[in-house]
Amino acid sequence: MVGGAAGLVVALLLGVLLSAEVRFVLRAAYEEARILLARRSIAELLDDPELGEDRRTMFRLVLDARDFAANSLGLAAGDTYTTFAEVGRDTLVLVVTGARRDTLAPFLWRYPIVGAVPYKGFFDFEAARATATRLERRGYDTYLRPSAAFSTLGWFNDPLPSTALRRGPVSLVELVIHEIAHNTLYVPDATPFDESFALFVGYRGAEAFFLGQGDTARAERVRAIWRDQKRLSGFYADLVTELEALYAAHLPAEPRERERQALFDRAQERLMGPLAEQLEAFDAASVAERPLNNASLLAFRIYLTDVDLFDRLLAEHGGDLRATVGAIRAAIDARGDRDPFEVLATMVPH
Protein backbone atom coordinates (compact mmCIF):
# COMPACT_ATOMS: atom_id res chain seq x y z
CA MET A 1 0.00 0.00 0.00
CA VAL A 2 0.94 3.62 0.04
CA GLY A 3 3.55 4.50 2.53
CA GLY A 4 6.25 2.02 3.45
CA ALA A 5 9.02 3.00 1.05
CA ALA A 6 6.81 4.05 -1.62
CA GLY A 7 9.00 6.55 -3.37
CA LEU A 8 9.56 9.85 -1.48
CA VAL A 9 10.90 13.03 -3.08
CA VAL A 10 12.11 15.28 -0.28
CA ALA A 11 14.31 18.32 -0.32
CA LEU A 12 16.35 17.36 2.72
CA LEU A 13 19.61 18.78 1.43
CA LEU A 14 18.45 21.18 -1.25
CA GLY A 15 16.86 23.45 1.35
CA VAL A 16 19.96 23.77 3.47
CA LEU A 17 21.04 27.23 2.38
CA LEU A 18 17.62 28.86 2.54
CA SER A 19 15.89 27.08 5.40
CA ALA A 20 15.34 28.92 8.66
CA GLU A 21 14.89 25.74 10.67
CA VAL A 22 18.48 25.37 11.76
CA ARG A 23 18.14 22.14 13.70
CA PHE A 24 16.32 20.43 10.85
CA VAL A 25 18.82 21.72 8.31
CA LEU A 26 21.90 20.67 10.25
CA ARG A 27 20.53 17.20 10.94
CA ALA A 28 19.45 16.75 7.31
CA ALA A 29 22.83 17.89 6.00
CA TYR A 30 24.66 15.64 8.44
CA GLU A 31 22.55 12.57 7.65
CA GLU A 32 22.70 13.07 3.89
CA ALA A 33 26.47 13.52 4.06
CA ARG A 34 26.75 10.42 6.24
CA ILE A 35 24.76 8.38 3.73
CA LEU A 36 26.80 9.64 0.79
CA LEU A 37 30.09 8.98 2.58
CA ALA A 38 28.94 5.46 3.47
CA ARG A 39 28.36 4.52 -0.17
CA ARG A 40 29.97 1.32 -1.42
CA SER A 41 29.85 0.04 -4.97
CA ILE A 42 27.29 -2.74 -5.33
CA ALA A 43 29.44 -4.33 -8.04
CA GLU A 44 32.37 -4.47 -5.62
CA LEU A 45 30.18 -5.86 -2.87
CA LEU A 46 29.09 -8.63 -5.22
CA ASP A 47 32.75 -9.53 -5.72
CA ASP A 48 33.14 -10.07 -1.97
CA PRO A 49 33.05 -13.84 -1.25
CA GLU A 50 31.92 -13.07 2.31
CA LEU A 51 28.70 -11.42 1.12
CA GLY A 52 25.62 -13.31 2.35
CA GLU A 53 23.48 -15.05 -0.24
CA ASP A 54 20.34 -13.08 0.62
CA ARG A 55 22.04 -9.74 0.05
CA ARG A 56 23.79 -11.06 -3.04
CA THR A 57 20.40 -11.97 -4.53
CA MET A 58 18.87 -8.60 -3.66
CA PHE A 59 21.85 -6.62 -4.97
CA ARG A 60 21.72 -8.47 -8.29
CA LEU A 61 18.00 -7.78 -8.47
CA VAL A 62 18.59 -4.06 -7.88
CA LEU A 63 21.22 -3.83 -10.62
CA ASP A 64 19.04 -5.79 -13.03
CA ALA A 65 16.04 -3.57 -12.26
CA ARG A 66 17.95 -0.31 -12.74
CA ASP A 67 19.44 -1.60 -16.00
CA PHE A 68 15.95 -2.51 -17.16
CA ALA A 69 14.68 0.94 -16.18
CA ALA A 70 17.42 2.60 -18.22
CA ASN A 71 17.65 0.32 -21.24
CA SER A 72 14.10 -0.97 -21.67
CA LEU A 73 12.04 1.91 -20.26
CA GLY A 74 14.28 4.82 -21.23
CA LEU A 75 14.38 6.22 -17.69
CA ALA A 76 17.17 8.49 -16.46
CA ALA A 77 18.90 6.01 -14.17
CA GLY A 78 22.29 7.73 -14.12
CA ASP A 79 24.27 6.18 -11.28
CA THR A 80 21.27 5.88 -8.97
CA TYR A 81 21.38 2.64 -6.94
CA THR A 82 24.77 1.53 -8.24
CA THR A 83 25.99 1.99 -4.66
CA PHE A 84 24.76 0.85 -1.26
CA ALA A 85 24.75 2.56 2.14
CA GLU A 86 24.23 0.94 5.52
CA VAL A 87 22.12 3.40 7.54
CA GLY A 88 21.96 1.44 10.79
CA ARG A 89 18.20 1.54 11.41
CA ASP A 90 14.92 0.18 10.09
CA THR A 91 13.40 3.49 8.94
CA LEU A 92 15.29 6.07 6.91
CA VAL A 93 13.04 9.08 7.46
CA LEU A 94 9.79 9.82 9.26
CA VAL A 95 7.44 11.85 7.09
CA VAL A 96 4.97 14.43 8.44
CA THR A 97 1.83 15.50 6.61
CA GLY A 98 -0.52 18.20 7.89
CA ALA A 99 -3.95 19.43 6.78
CA ARG A 100 -6.62 21.78 8.02
CA ARG A 101 -9.56 20.11 9.73
CA ASP A 102 -12.23 22.20 7.96
CA THR A 103 -11.03 21.74 4.38
CA LEU A 104 -8.86 19.39 2.35
CA ALA A 105 -5.98 21.83 2.18
CA PRO A 106 -2.48 20.51 2.99
CA PHE A 107 0.10 22.33 5.03
CA LEU A 108 2.90 23.15 2.58
CA TRP A 109 6.64 23.31 3.08
CA ARG A 110 8.58 25.25 0.47
CA TYR A 111 12.04 24.44 -0.82
CA PRO A 112 14.31 25.73 -3.57
CA ILE A 113 14.01 23.94 -6.93
CA VAL A 114 11.33 21.43 -5.88
CA GLY A 115 8.81 24.10 -4.87
CA ALA A 116 5.94 23.57 -2.45
CA VAL A 117 5.70 20.05 -1.01
CA PRO A 118 2.84 18.73 1.19
CA TYR A 119 5.10 16.68 3.46
CA LYS A 120 8.38 16.93 5.30
CA GLY A 121 10.83 14.11 5.93
CA PHE A 122 12.87 13.98 9.14
CA PHE A 123 15.94 11.94 9.99
CA ASP A 124 15.34 13.07 13.58
CA PHE A 125 12.18 11.18 14.55
CA GLU A 126 11.59 13.19 17.73
CA ALA A 127 11.71 16.37 15.65
CA ALA A 128 9.11 14.85 13.32
CA ARG A 129 6.81 14.09 16.24
CA ALA A 130 7.37 17.57 17.68
CA THR A 131 6.48 19.13 14.34
CA ALA A 132 3.27 17.09 14.22
CA THR A 133 2.42 18.19 17.77
CA ARG A 134 2.94 21.86 16.87
CA LEU A 135 0.67 21.50 13.86
CA GLU A 136 -2.00 19.81 15.99
CA ARG A 137 -1.86 22.69 18.48
CA ARG A 138 -2.58 25.02 15.58
CA GLY A 139 -5.68 23.01 14.71
CA TYR A 140 -4.29 20.79 11.96
CA ASP A 141 -4.80 17.10 11.38
CA THR A 142 -1.47 15.29 11.14
CA TYR A 143 -0.18 11.98 9.86
CA LEU A 144 3.22 10.35 10.44
CA ARG A 145 4.55 7.58 8.23
CA PRO A 146 7.93 5.89 7.81
CA SER A 147 9.82 5.85 4.53
CA ALA A 148 12.64 3.53 3.54
CA ALA A 149 14.00 5.67 0.68
CA PHE A 150 13.90 9.06 -1.00
CA SER A 151 15.15 10.65 -4.18
CA THR A 152 17.40 13.69 -4.63
CA LEU A 153 16.09 13.92 -8.23
CA GLY A 154 19.47 13.11 -9.70
CA TRP A 155 21.35 15.86 -7.84
CA PHE A 156 23.34 13.14 -6.10
CA ASN A 157 24.03 9.54 -7.04
CA ASP A 158 21.55 8.13 -4.57
CA PRO A 159 22.76 4.93 -2.92
CA LEU A 160 20.42 2.09 -2.12
CA PRO A 161 19.77 2.48 1.63
CA SER A 162 19.88 -0.65 3.74
CA THR A 163 16.28 0.06 4.80
CA ALA A 164 15.16 -0.83 1.26
CA LEU A 165 16.43 -4.39 1.68
CA ARG A 166 13.69 -5.10 4.21
CA ARG A 167 11.34 -5.31 1.23
CA GLY A 168 10.55 -8.42 -0.75
CA PRO A 169 11.69 -8.78 -4.37
CA VAL A 170 8.48 -7.39 -5.90
CA SER A 171 8.44 -4.34 -3.66
CA LEU A 172 12.18 -3.76 -4.10
CA VAL A 173 11.99 -3.73 -7.90
CA GLU A 174 9.00 -1.37 -7.75
CA LEU A 175 10.97 0.94 -5.45
CA VAL A 176 14.01 1.03 -7.74
CA ILE A 177 11.97 1.88 -10.83
CA HIS A 178 9.76 4.32 -8.89
CA GLU A 179 12.69 6.36 -7.62
CA ILE A 180 14.41 6.37 -11.03
CA ALA A 181 11.13 7.63 -12.50
CA HIS A 182 11.50 10.69 -10.26
CA ASN A 183 14.90 11.36 -11.83
CA THR A 184 13.23 11.16 -15.23
CA LEU A 185 10.26 13.50 -14.72
CA TYR A 186 9.60 15.93 -11.90
CA VAL A 187 7.18 18.87 -12.03
CA PRO A 188 7.75 21.48 -9.27
CA ASP A 189 4.69 22.29 -7.14
CA ALA A 190 2.84 19.23 -8.49
CA THR A 191 3.50 16.53 -5.89
CA PRO A 192 0.35 14.43 -6.53
CA PHE A 193 1.25 14.23 -10.22
CA ASP A 194 4.91 13.45 -9.52
CA GLU A 195 4.15 10.68 -7.05
CA SER A 196 1.25 9.18 -9.00
CA PHE A 197 3.37 9.12 -12.16
CA ALA A 198 6.24 7.42 -10.31
CA LEU A 199 3.87 4.91 -8.71
CA PHE A 200 2.42 4.03 -12.12
CA VAL A 201 5.86 3.65 -13.71
CA GLY A 202 7.12 1.70 -10.69
CA TYR A 203 4.37 -0.92 -10.78
CA ARG A 204 3.94 -1.20 -14.53
CA GLY A 205 7.72 -1.23 -14.90
CA ALA A 206 8.08 -3.97 -12.27
CA GLU A 207 5.44 -6.03 -14.08
CA ALA A 208 7.34 -5.70 -17.37
CA PHE A 209 10.63 -6.49 -15.62
CA PHE A 210 9.41 -9.77 -14.14
CA LEU A 211 7.71 -10.77 -17.39
CA GLY A 212 11.02 -10.20 -19.15
CA GLN A 213 12.67 -12.46 -16.58
CA GLY A 214 10.10 -15.17 -17.24
CA ASP A 215 8.84 -14.83 -13.66
CA THR A 216 5.11 -14.89 -14.33
CA ALA A 217 4.20 -15.46 -10.67
CA ARG A 218 5.87 -12.23 -9.54
CA ALA A 219 4.51 -10.36 -12.57
CA GLU A 220 0.99 -11.42 -11.57
CA ARG A 221 1.71 -10.39 -7.98
CA VAL A 222 2.64 -6.92 -9.24
CA ARG A 223 -0.56 -6.76 -11.29
CA ALA A 224 -2.65 -7.75 -8.25
CA ILE A 225 -1.03 -5.05 -6.11
CA TRP A 226 -1.59 -2.47 -8.85
CA ARG A 227 -5.26 -3.45 -9.13
CA ASP A 228 -5.58 -2.99 -5.37
CA GLN A 229 -3.88 0.40 -5.60
CA LYS A 230 -6.46 1.48 -8.17
CA ARG A 231 -9.31 0.20 -5.99
CA LEU A 232 -7.97 2.20 -3.08
CA SER A 233 -7.57 5.21 -5.36
CA GLY A 234 -11.29 5.05 -6.12
CA PHE A 235 -12.15 4.53 -2.45
CA TYR A 236 -10.17 7.60 -1.37
CA ALA A 237 -11.51 9.68 -4.29
CA ASP A 238 -15.08 8.91 -3.19
CA LEU A 239 -14.26 9.90 0.39
CA VAL A 240 -12.68 13.14 -0.85
CA THR A 241 -15.90 13.96 -2.74
CA GLU A 242 -17.99 13.38 0.38
CA LEU A 243 -15.72 15.50 2.56
CA GLU A 244 -15.57 18.33 0.03
CA ALA A 245 -19.38 18.46 0.04
CA LEU A 246 -19.40 18.58 3.85
CA TYR A 247 -16.80 21.34 4.06
CA ALA A 248 -18.54 23.35 1.32
CA ALA A 249 -21.64 23.51 3.56
CA HIS A 250 -19.69 25.70 6.04
CA LEU A 251 -21.34 24.19 9.11
CA PRO A 252 -20.42 25.44 12.59
CA ALA A 253 -17.46 23.62 14.09
CA GLU A 254 -19.32 21.20 16.37
CA PRO A 255 -21.79 19.74 13.83
CA ARG A 256 -19.08 19.73 11.16
CA GLU A 257 -16.85 17.62 13.40
CA ARG A 258 -19.71 15.19 14.10
CA GLU A 259 -20.50 14.81 10.41
CA ARG A 260 -16.83 14.47 9.56
CA GLN A 261 -16.33 11.66 12.05
CA ALA A 262 -19.47 9.94 10.78
CA LEU A 263 -18.05 10.05 7.24
CA PHE A 264 -14.78 8.53 8.41
CA ASP A 265 -16.64 5.82 10.35
CA ARG A 266 -18.72 4.88 7.31
CA ALA A 267 -15.60 4.83 5.16
CA GLN A 268 -13.97 2.37 7.55
CA GLU A 269 -17.07 0.19 7.35
CA ARG A 270 -16.88 0.21 3.53
CA LEU A 271 -13.20 -0.63 3.73
CA MET A 272 -13.81 -3.63 5.97
CA GLY A 273 -16.92 -4.70 4.04
CA PRO A 274 -17.38 -4.44 0.26
CA LEU A 275 -13.87 -3.21 -0.51
CA ALA A 276 -12.19 -5.88 1.62
CA GLU A 277 -13.86 -8.56 -0.49
CA GLN A 278 -12.33 -7.07 -3.66
CA LEU A 279 -8.75 -6.69 -2.45
CA GLU A 280 -6.38 -9.31 -3.88
CA ALA A 281 -2.96 -8.50 -2.43
CA PHE A 282 -3.59 -6.12 0.46
CA ASP A 283 -4.96 -7.06 3.85
CA ALA A 284 -7.99 -4.86 4.51
CA ALA A 285 -7.50 -5.01 8.28
CA SER A 286 -3.96 -3.67 7.94
CA VAL A 287 -5.14 -0.88 5.63
CA ALA A 288 -7.94 -0.03 8.06
CA GLU A 289 -5.46 0.33 10.92
CA ARG A 290 -4.13 3.50 9.34
CA PRO A 291 -5.80 6.56 10.87
CA LEU A 292 -8.33 8.44 8.76
CA ASN A 293 -8.24 12.22 8.91
CA ASN A 294 -7.67 15.01 6.42
CA ALA A 295 -3.89 14.71 6.63
CA SER A 296 -3.74 10.94 6.15
CA LEU A 297 -6.29 11.11 3.34
CA LEU A 298 -4.23 13.71 1.50
CA ALA A 299 -1.07 11.65 2.13
CA PHE A 300 -2.70 8.60 0.54
CA ARG A 301 -4.06 10.66 -2.35
CA ILE A 302 -0.62 12.11 -3.11
CA TYR A 303 0.32 8.71 -4.54
CA LEU A 304 -3.08 7.69 -5.87
CA THR A 305 -4.44 10.64 -7.85
CA ASP A 306 -6.11 9.69 -11.15
CA VAL A 307 -3.88 6.63 -11.51
CA ASP A 308 -6.36 5.05 -13.93
CA LEU A 309 -5.60 7.93 -16.30
CA PHE A 310 -2.04 6.65 -16.65
CA ASP A 311 -3.32 3.15 -17.42
CA ARG A 312 -5.65 4.51 -20.10
CA LEU A 313 -2.71 6.29 -21.66
CA LEU A 314 -0.70 3.05 -21.52
CA ALA A 315 -3.53 1.30 -23.38
CA GLU A 316 -3.48 4.07 -26.01
CA HIS A 317 0.17 3.17 -26.63
CA GLY A 318 -0.55 -0.53 -26.99
CA GLY A 319 0.86 -1.40 -23.57
CA ASP A 320 4.28 0.05 -24.48
CA LEU A 321 5.46 1.61 -21.22
CA ARG A 322 8.56 3.19 -22.75
CA ALA A 323 6.46 4.94 -25.40
CA THR A 324 3.93 6.00 -22.76
CA VAL A 325 6.59 7.57 -20.55
CA GLY A 326 8.07 9.33 -23.57
CA ALA A 327 4.68 10.73 -24.56
CA ILE A 328 4.01 11.94 -21.02
CA ARG A 329 7.40 13.64 -20.81
CA ALA A 330 6.91 15.37 -24.15
CA ALA A 331 3.43 16.58 -23.21
CA ILE A 332 4.55 17.86 -19.82
CA ASP A 333 7.53 19.66 -21.35
CA ALA A 334 5.14 21.48 -23.69
CA ARG A 335 2.38 22.12 -21.15
CA GLY A 336 3.13 25.73 -20.27
CA ASP A 337 1.40 26.50 -16.98
CA ARG A 338 -1.42 23.97 -17.38
CA ASP A 339 -2.11 21.41 -14.67
CA PRO A 340 -0.25 18.19 -15.59
CA PHE A 341 -3.33 16.03 -15.00
CA GLU A 342 -5.33 18.22 -17.38
CA VAL A 343 -2.59 17.69 -19.96
CA LEU A 344 -2.83 13.91 -19.57
CA ALA A 345 -6.62 14.01 -19.84
CA THR A 346 -6.34 15.57 -23.31
CA MET A 347 -4.16 12.66 -24.44
CA VAL A 348 -6.79 9.92 -24.01
CA PRO A 349 -10.26 9.49 -25.56
CA HIS A 350 -13.17 10.51 -23.36
Each PLM stretch: what is its role?
Residues 1-87, 280, 304-350:
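N-terminal low-structure segments adjacent to metalloprotease catalytic domains
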Residues 13-45, 163, 170, 195, ...:
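Metalloprotease/metallohydrolase-associated module, dominated by Zn2+-dependent proteases
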Residues 29-31, 155-157, 284-286:
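Short, motif-level signal for alpha-helix interfacial/capping segments enriched in acidic residues
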Residues 47-51, 64-74, 181-185, 202-214, ...:
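Sec-exported extracytoplasmic/periplasmic mature domains
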Residues 65-229, 241:
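Acidic/His-rich structured neighborhood in mature extracellular/periplasmic domains
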